């Protein structure tokens, strides 16, 4: 019969192996690649992400009394969804989780703001920096605001 310390070591090893197998079966939820964002008084949305993040941008024209919406999907999961009141032509900015493993930043404009989707381009300025210039956006009343640095 094995001494008590050997049995205890075997038991601890078995528990450790089971815990490892269990944690590998659970899908990992990576933190959002979005590190910081800012909407400038010039009508530019600036994003800072983890290096080489792949972003997708979308446009939805105004309808049913709601303003035009532009949103960007970013890899990784946001911890705390939130809404921020906009300024000037921006009605609101929302950060949320559209699905597991993704973060969405939505810029909703006031209903009277008219934007042409052909004038909008999300471009990378560095491996971890992005800009979306809202050409034609009225800048009166816009102030710099955002989160992070």
What are these language model-derived features?
Residues 22-149:
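Signal-peptide-cleaved, periplasmic/extracellular N-terminal interaction regions immediately downstream
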Residues 1-2, 149:
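Accessible peptide chain termini
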Residues 10-21:
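Bacterial N-terminal signal peptides
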Residues 2-12:
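Bacterial N-terminal signal peptides that target proteins for export
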């Amino acid at each position: 019969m094995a001494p008590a310390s050997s049995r205890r070591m075997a038991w601890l090893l078995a528990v450790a192996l089971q815990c490892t197998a269990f944690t590998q079966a659970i899908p990992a939820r990576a933190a959002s690649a979005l590190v910081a964002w800012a909407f400038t008084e010039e009508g530019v949305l600036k994003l800072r992400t983890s290096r080489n993040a792949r972003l997708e941008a979308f446009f939805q024209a105004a309808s049913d009394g709601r303003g035009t919406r532009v949103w960007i999907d970013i890899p990784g999961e946001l911890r705390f969804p939130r809404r921020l009141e906009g300024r000037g032509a921006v009605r609101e900015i929302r950060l949320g989780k559209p699905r597991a493993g993704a973060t969405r930043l939505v810029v909703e404009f006031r209903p009277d703001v008219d934007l042409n989707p052909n004038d909008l381009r999300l471009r990378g300025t560095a491996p971890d920096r992005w800009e979306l210039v809202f050409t034609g956006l009225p800048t009166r009343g816009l102030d710099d605001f955002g989160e992070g640095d």
